[in-house]
């Protein structure tokens, strides 16, 4: 009985061991080491990753300190190479005298503390490390408007490349990051909108002199990724290295100066400001000096001048908003607007003068003879003006043509000189007088209209004497009465004719006076129109010419003739 019990117990144990062994084998087959959850298990797994081992090796606190300049011999300076790539000109703020640029910065230096053998770390020759785990130079933009780095630079990671294959210690670090710099720039807008600006980025360390950090840079700034600007054209962007000594330190400081030369594109200002201003001025000047309106009045031209002045003032304010506040010089476009305003002001004043000239017709006095000769004879030929036919007719009827009057004066002056010379010679012919046509044509015509029949020498009297011998006394008395009545009627008619002729002549002279002053104002209008249109054209062409000369002087600084 006891033997049977022992046999049963042994069989049960064998079966239990077999079952446990099978379940253990099944569990081992389904085991996945990635399912480890404990920290110790993860550390054991991560230690086998080469990149993790390399990073922990390089950044271990026992061998690397971000506060220490990464060079084994601290008596030597650490060389830092800087490259700049211009991406975009964001804004040029003339009133604030600054410029905003989007650039890509690259700083390269050698970190002698980051040393590893790629053979020990899975042939890893290069790795990426966050910037805050490594020492970086305190490179600073001296003339930055914004002081905070968070507002200007966006730091990323640093690429480390081993120098093991070069047989040297350490690693080469490349620190690439984008930046938006707003730098101060003294803008010279003397020849605006044909100006060229030179803005400089001053880059160096803020706390380390040349003995600690020695900066180098590429000569040219890369423009491969540059987005062209619609207003500015980049002429050059070069980096210059300088060494300066300051009073604080015995060692010199290395300063990198990146000079950005940009030139403004003037087409926008020509199309939107200069040409419209010239057109408005020409229209205003043409309105100033055109003939009178239908109501024979020029007073509306004063209102036109004042309105144009207001328009020019508004345009000048628009330009001044883009200019910096300076008293050192006046920009070229400001000279242009100032000249245009002066031209319009003088034109408005001279329009008042023309109105005054036109208004003198109410006084009933003709212009002086020299004025008549200049404005009625000389200037109309030059200005391609014709004397109005009514005025020419009046000159012919009144024998008052300015050219004939001048000729008569010359002939009278010559004849007087001849008479004076003849008197000195005491010639018998000196008693003779040359007939003078002092009277007008109307007076000559009037002298033949009426004949005094009572004159004893008249032919009517002679004829009346012949029959007076035959008739009787009664007939003679009747004849004498008739002749007396005729003589009185003739005298009355002569007086009436004289009064009528005088009134007609007076009306003609008043009409002549009015037409002459009106034509004088028209000649003045045409003359001033040509003068002021020429002035506007000269001012506009002068602006463009001076601007082109300024651009030429920028491109040819050695040419002294065009050096501005």
UniProtKB/Swiss-Prot annotation:
> What membrane topology is given?
Multi-pass membrane protein
* Cellular component annotations (GO), alphabetically ordered: neuron projection; plasma membrane; postsynaptic membrane; synapse; transmembrane transporter complex
Q: Give me the disulphide-bonded residues.
A: 185-199, 248-249
PROSITE patterns, per database record: NEUROTR_ION_CHANNEL (PS00236)
A GO BP annotation = chemical synaptic transmission
Q: Name one Pfam family in it.
A: Neur_chan_LBD
- Extracellular membrane side: 21-268
Single GO MF descriptor: transmitter-gated monoatomic ion channel activity involved in regulation of postsynaptic membrane potential
User: Among its keywords, does the record have Cell wall biogenesis/degradation?
Assistant: no
| Residues annotated as transmembrane | 269-289, 302-319, 329-353, 527-547
User: What does this chain do?
Assistant: Subunit of the non-synaptic neuronal acetylcholine receptor, which may play a role in chemotaxis towards choline. After binding choline or acetylcholine, the AChR responds by an extensive change in conformation that affects all subunits and leads to opening of an ion-conducting channel across the plasma membrane.
> To which protein family does this belong?
Belongs to the ligand-gated ion channel (TC 1.A.9) family. Acetylcholine receptor (TC 1.A.9.1) subfamily.
The subunit structure is: The functional receptor is a heteromer of deg-3 and des-2. Interacts with ric-3; which is required for proper receptor folding.
- Further information: This locus is redundant or nonessential as suppression of deg-3 function results in wild-type revertants.
Protein name (Swiss-Prot/TrEMBL): Acetylcholine receptor subunit alpha-type deg-3
Name its species.
Answer: Caenorhabditis elegans
Query: What's the encoding gene here?
Result: deg-3
């Amino acid at each position: 009985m006891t033997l049977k019990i022992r046999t049963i117990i042994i069989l049960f144990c064998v079966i239990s061991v077999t079952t446990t062994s099978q379940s253990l084998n099944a569990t081992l087959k389904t085991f996945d080491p990635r399912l480890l959850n404990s920290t110790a298990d993860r550390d054991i797994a991560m230690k086998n990753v080469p990149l993790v081992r390399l990073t922990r090796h390089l950044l271990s606190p026992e061998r690397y300190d971000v506060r220490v300049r990464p060079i084994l011999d601290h008596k030597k300076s650490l060389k830092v190479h800087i490259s700049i790539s211009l991406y975009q000109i964001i804004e040029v703020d003339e009133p604030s005298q600054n410029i905003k640029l989007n650039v890509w910065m690259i700083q390269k230096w050698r970190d002698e503390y980051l040393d590893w053998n790629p053979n020990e770390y899975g042939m890893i020759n290069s790795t990426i490390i966050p910037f805050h785990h490594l020492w970086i130079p305190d490179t600073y933009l001296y003339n930055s408007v914004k002081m905070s780095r968070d507002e200007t630079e966006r730091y990323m990671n640093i690429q480390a490349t081993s120098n093991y294959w070069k047989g040297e210690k350490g690693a080469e670090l490349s620190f690439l990051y984008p930046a938006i710099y707003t730098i101060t720039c003294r803008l010279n807008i003397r020849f605006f909108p044909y100006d060229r600006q030179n803005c400089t980025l001053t880059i160096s360390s803020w706390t380390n002199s040349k003995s600690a950090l020695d900066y180098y840079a590429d000569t040219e700034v890369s423009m491969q990724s540059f987005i062209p600007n619609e207003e500015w054209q980049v002429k050059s962007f070069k980096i210059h290295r300088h060494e300066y000594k300051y009073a604080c330190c015995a060692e010199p400081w290395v300063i990198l100066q990146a000079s950005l030369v940009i030139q403004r594109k003037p087409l926008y200002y020509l199309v939107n400001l200069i040409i419209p201003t010239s057109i408005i001025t020409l229209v205003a000047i043409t309105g100033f000096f055109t003939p009178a309106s239908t109501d024979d009045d020029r007073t509306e031209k004063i209102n036109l001048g004042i309105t144009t002045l207001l328009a020019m003032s508004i345009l000048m304010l628009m330009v001044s908003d883009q200019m910096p506040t300076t008293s050192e010089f006046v920009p070229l476009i400001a000279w242009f607007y100032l000249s245009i305003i002066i031209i319009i002001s003088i034109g408005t004043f001279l329009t008042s003068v023309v109105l005054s000239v036109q208004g003198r017709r109410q006084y009933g006095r003709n212009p002086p003879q020299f004025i008549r000769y200049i404005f009625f004879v000389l200037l109309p030929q030059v200005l391609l003006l014709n004397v109005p036919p009514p005025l020419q007719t009046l000159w012919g009827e009144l024998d008052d043509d300015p050219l004939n009057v001048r000729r008569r004066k010359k002939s009278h002056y010559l004849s007087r000189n001849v008479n004076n010379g003849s008197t000195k010679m005491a010639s018998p012919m000196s008693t003779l007088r040359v007939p003078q046509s002092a009277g007008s044509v109307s007076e000559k015509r009037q002298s033949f209209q009426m004949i005094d029949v009572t004159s004893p020498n008249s032919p009517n009297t002679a004829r009346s004497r012949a029959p007076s011998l035959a008739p009787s006394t009664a007939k003679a008395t009747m004849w004498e009465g008739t002749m007396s009545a005729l003589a009185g009627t003739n005298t009355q008619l002569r007086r009436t004719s004289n009064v009528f002729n005088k009134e007609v002549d007076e009306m003609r002279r008043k009409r002549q006076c009015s037409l002459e002053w009106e034509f004088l104002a028209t000649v003045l209008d045409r003359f001033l129109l040509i003068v002021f249109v020429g002035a506007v054209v000269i001012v506009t062409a002068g602006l463009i010419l001076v601007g082109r000369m300024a651009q030429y002087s920028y491109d040819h600084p050695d040419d002294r003739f065009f050096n501005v």
